[in-house]
Amino acid sequence: MPIRPDLQQLEKCIDDALRKNDFKPLKTLLQIDICEDVKIKCSKQFFHKVDNLICRELNKEDIHNVSAILVSVGRCGKNISVLGQAGLLTMIKQGLIQKMVAWFEKSKDIIQSQGNSKDEAVLNMIEDLVDLLLVIHDVSDEGKKQVVESFVPRICSLVIDSRVNICIQQEIIKKMNAMLDKMPQDARKILSNQEMLILMSSMGERILDAGDYDLQVGIVEALCRMTTEKQRQELAHQWFSMDFIAKAFKRIKDSEFETDCRIFLNLVNGMLGDKRRVFTFPCLSAFLDKYELQIPSDEKLEEFWIDFNLGSQTLSFYIAGDNDDHQWEAVTVPEEKVQIYSIEVRESKKLLTIILKNTVKISKREGKELLLYFDASLEITNVTQKIFGATKHRESIRKQGISVAKTSLHILFDASGSQILVPESQISPVGEELVSLKEKSKSPKEFAKPSKYIKNSDKGNRNNSQLEKTTPSKRKMSEASMIVSGADRYTMRSPVLFSNTSIPPRRRRIKPPLQMTSSAEKPSVSQTSENRVDNAASLKSRSSEGRHRRDNIDKHIKTAKCVENTENKNVEFPNQNFSELQDVIPDSQAAEKRDHTILPGVLDNICGNKIHSKWACWTPVTNIELCNNQRASTSSGDTLNQDIVINKKLTKQKSSSSISDHNSEGTGKVKYKKEQTDHIKIDKAEVEVCKKHNQQQNHPKYSGQKNTENAKQSDWPVESETTFKSVLLNKTIEESLIYRKKYILSKDVNTATCDKNPSASKNVQSHRKAEKELTSELNSWDSKQKKMREKSKGKEFTNVAESLISQINKRYKTKDDIKSTRKLKESLINSGFSNKPVVQLSKEKVQKKSYRKLKTTFVNVTSECPVNDVYNFNLNGADDPIIKLGIQEFQATAKEACADRSIRLVGPRNHDELKSSVKTKDKKIITNHQKKNLFSDTETEYRCDDSKTDISWLREPKSKPQLIDYSRNKNVKNHKSGKSRSSLEKGQPSSKMTPSKNITKKMDKTIPEGRIRLPRKATKTKKNYKDLSNSESECEQEFSHSFKENIPVKEENIHSRMKTVKLPKKQQKVFCAETEKELSKQWKNSSLLKDAIRDNCLDLSPRSLSGSPSSIEVTRCIEKITEKDFTQDYDCITKSISPYPKTSSLESLNSNSGVGGTIKSPKNNEKNFLCASESCSPIPRPLFLPRHTPTKSNTIVNRKKISSLVLTQETQNSNSYSDVSSYSSEERFMEIESPHINENYIQSKREESHLASSLSKSSEGREKTWFDMPCDATHVSGPTQHLSRKRIYIEDNLSNSNEVEMEEKGERRANLLPKKLCKIEDADHHIHKMSESVSSLSTNDFSIPWETWQNEFAGIEMTYETYERLNSEFKRRNNIRHKMLSYFTTQSWKTAQQHLRTMNHQSQDSRIKKLDKFQFIIIEELENFEKDSQSLKDLEKEFVDFWEKIFQKFSAYQKSEQQRLHLLKTSLAKSVFCNTDSEETVFTSEMCLMKEDMKVLQDRLLKDMLEEELLNVRRELMSVFMSHERNANV
């Protein structure tokens, strides 16, 4: 062999690395090519030097140096010569394989420390080590046996270790299979031991969770190579627990391994279902750039399988090689090699395009782009994203650059309910701009889309994305876009809502909920949408497509809903049609206030849920609000609720984008609001008109008149069906964009405020329920929408718009607001409107239960058909449709909203409205108190019937949130205390209305739509630490309105109220002080008066401060007590006494109604509402009536000073004092009185100055008393009582200006008390207040008329002057005594109640503490028990594992012992025992040799002796001859 000097330096390089730690020479040596005939001489110490160097570097974990050493030894191994012998053989004898085992173990430790992370250096090191093993394996049979015996078990253990990276496992399993392929037959016995059987079983389990198809194949191949076919039949059931898998494994044949293994692994992976980590899909064709890759030529290979490996994050498949035998060639595409990929549908095929970072060579073909075609039905998107990541998805990147289609699309509905897109440009030029804005907002909406939408439409998503990218303006009607049945809406996963197929099957359709956004939202929406687009980022492209679809859909849906609603008016959803039409109609609608009113509760909920993501915006058009704005707003609110629900989900998915969008929306809102103002004015007028219309429809009378009303509405409905249809079609898109934008703005505003609203979460839940119902309703709407579409005509729309404008102009003036409001109230009262239903509506809206039937709700609200529908107003438990009151109030609110919008109603009214808005919109911004506050949802008459959500959702979402918030209560408290509204605003905004003024404005807009309430909204709900249910609070407000109108006004109370109303905010406190002074003058005992005032304050404050009376539970208990006590008191008291409370309440109500809700003091407003609600509520309240009746009869006392009307009223009601069932009389009283509210108000105002101070005192006391009584009654009677409760609030506030100060004190005290205590205290206060007021009334009334004196005491001579003195003195003393007694009674009662409360509180606390302690102990012991149980389980497991290890070790020991004995026996037999045969042969052979040797020696001896004798003879002869010659010579 030739010797190359450069390669002779191998050992020297090893020495340098070992001694000098210099690996450069060694790495340089590796670059030299080595020929087979080159011989490298090394010393005997070379092996030890290599071992020491590798061990050192492994300990240092210097992977690169270890690889260099292993590569050098592996490459030069066959050329190394040690002392003239083969180097590897010599090193094997020196223990190379045993040393390599140690190297492998140390390398294994390094691998395990790396975890599953992929490290190229470690992977290369393991490959180099295994390559060296292969070199040694091929040297000799001895080397093969040692390598297999030592390394196969270790490699198997490394393969089944889940902590090792899959790539490493793939490499070593391949090398192990290469070893096993060359393994000699006798070496199989080595693999039949128990240890290998256990490892094989573990390898079988590893197949299930390998996560890579190549690894699975390698494991199956190893199992097949380590066992014979017969052994596999026996061991398969041990390896696989499931029989069908074991049988499939048995069917694998060595001759058909590739195909059989494919069948087996496809079965295994398919069986795993969602848990599988290898997804295999059949590929139709594969291309590398332009070159097609061929499927392996195998008859059994049915499909061109592509494997998506989640574990290794690779895509792999096999192709036919270019060699002659067409062997299989594996192609693997790892994630790190992919630059970008895309998935799209082309010609009913799904194309996966993978662009690689570098050019690759596959089967002699080079390329950089891999194209894989799949069947369109296969879902490969999610799997591909899991492997390559979503960031490399071209769709998300490409869509960012996609231009947004500016063409407005108009939606029509065909007979099947399919939505058809028509270029909006063909319908109205304005639509394009709106659509562009809308599309901008769509991107965020798209992100907001729930994932459920996204998944189902993945297939159509690509097509739709392409279509929508271009959004052809010439889109044909046959090209239906985004159609999904309502039932499928919420089950869909994918965001793609549209499918390009013409009228796709309904099961594939998705109809997004209607988007109820007012036109006022336009600008802000566009801005918001733009911001959202920015936030979209990489997802933008997808979202943009979805946005386009969704926006169009939203528009279409809005239109469709509106149209369908109109048609359904007489069918399923009598009331809803109109409202939705109104929502869809013109931008001129009262969008601003309604905007937020529509979504007040919904928006609050949305905000509370932080659903202000794009979804809220994409609700279909709310434009059709003209006719039934309230209803429309309700429907819109409901729709928004649906959207909100969806948004909620979306928001969760894409909270970041939604949040940023929300911020952008906030900014856009400001700009947008400016633009909205123009539309708002017009819209408000329209809203009012619609409200009136709706009110008529919704009146209790309307329930009976629904058919008649339908005829009336037919003006709207007919026009709406036709013109509205056309409007919807033409304007729907524009308005949907605008309204959506508005909605987004309002939503953002509400979100800011609603997040603070505690009831928001509840509303969200209700939204979800509503969604389910809505889906079913949508289906019915689809068919109806087609009819509407056919009827749509632009000309009819114009007519309708003109009529709307004319009606708007009539009611658009601010001065008309109050009157219209009063008229609405009166009409409501006359119609016998059921307060309870209205309250329920608002409540449900607040709770978002309306969501369950948002669309249906819309229909019901607008439609007038008396269908016995779940959503029918009449079904609320009252004959009167719930919507009536809300609608009327809504109309009034709209009017007020108009006035407020420009002027913000005069101080007192504004203040009232502000307060009401605080109640109504606890979560909304107070900036626009007047607008927002004109009407509160609480005014909708809940009758404590929270469960009745069917109607509440029908109504416009009331501007007021569901529950009174603590923050709201604080605000209310401020109002009561007589502080300026500014202070209230500060308080409320800080707590709930922290959002910007823009938000407040938006909220204001929404309020009108929701249902604008009259001064009722201004009513200050009494603060209660425990918020009433939505139904309760709303009932109170609404009932208070009607009551105010119906109750006669007492002059003195009116006077105080008028002052309160007229006085500026700052003057309220002064006014309160003045009233107190007057009282003190009238009551000559100032100290008693103060005490009484304090008491009253304490009594009244809790309720007045709490937006609602004390909690239901507490109040009911109170009611029982108070009713008994009060009833007794009334019985004992003369009729003259009872009239006072009623008169006062009536006066307060009249003053409120007369002022038109301008009451300035929020406190007074709430009280007045409560009082008014009791007497006025059209709904009978048996428990409550006895008190009402006395109140009515009280008007008799003031006959002289009160108008004849009042006399008539009192006379009418005088007999109902003790009649618990005086519902009819009370109702008549309200009916008679309501029309004359203004008249009463004027009379009371005139007579105000004439009222005696004593009368005023008594009236005030009565008001207080009445206030307390109604509150109790309200709770007692239930929902109805709740309604009246609000009115009670109103009356008290109006009647008692003095109580302003008193309530301030009371409020302070109430705030300090816990919820429960406060409620109890409230009840107590009411009770003793009633008794006190009753007694005061009795003293005031106790007087003998002059006529009676003359007739009955004719015998006593007395002048009239003397009579007056005696009478006055008697009254004075009576009053003083009464005050003293009442004070004593009050204090005693308070003391007793305080002690009782303390005792109860302490006992409860102690019990609760004990229970908590016991619970804590139980929980702790349970935890300890669980820990102990777990420890026992662990111990048992460890014991089992330990026993198995012991068994294994014992088995190994037994086997080694047997081998040892055998070896000893054999050695003994060979070494110890003698073998004569062998010795004999040796002896024989040796003897023969000896004989031969002896013979040779003998012969040699004889020869020597003969030669010696002959020599002697010769010598003697010579001597003889010589002697003879001498002699001769001689």
UniProtKB/Swiss-Prot annotation:
Stretch list, region Disordered: 439-480, 496-555, 653-676, 693-717, 755-795, 962-1003
PTM summary: Phosphorylated.
Keyword terms: Cell cycle, Cell division, Chromosome, DNA-binding, Meiosis, Nucleus, Phosphoprotein
GO CC entries: condensed chromosome, centromeric region; lateral element; nucleus; synaptonemal complex
Taxonomic superkingdom: Eukaryota
Positions with biased composition (Basic residues): 970-979
Compositionally biased spans, kind Basic and acidic residues: 439-461, 542-555
Modified residues (Phosphothreonine): T471, T619, T938, T1189, T1339
Record-listed Phosphoserine modification sites: 457, 465, 494, 519, 529, 538, 660, 664, 936, 1136, 1138, 1145, 1161, 1177, 1204, 1234, 1253, 1295, 1297
Polar residues composition bias: residue spans: 515-530, 695-713, 755-764, 988-998
A GO biological process held by the record: fertilization
PANTHER family referenced in this protein's UniProt entry, alphabetically: SYNAPTONEMAL COMPLEX PROTEIN 2, SYNAPTONEMAL COMPLEX PROTEIN-RELATED
Disease connection: Spermatogenic failure 1: An infertility disorder characterized by azoospermia due to spermatogenic arrest during meiosis. Meiotic arrest is characterized by germ cells that enter meiosis and undergo the first chromosomal reduction from 4n to 2n, but that are then unable to proceed further. This results in tubules containing spermatocytes as the latest developmental stage of germ cells. Meiotically arrested spermatocytes accumulate in the tubules and degenerate. Both autosomal recessive and autosomal dominant inheritance have been reported.
Subunit field text: Component of the lateral elements of synaptonemal complexes. Heterodimer with SYCP3. Interacts with SMC1A and SMC3. Interacts with TEX11.
Protein name: Synaptonemal complex protein 2
Organism of this sequence: Homo sapiens (Human)
Lineage of producing organism: Eukaryota, Metazoa, Chordata, Craniata, Vertebrata
Gene: SYCP2
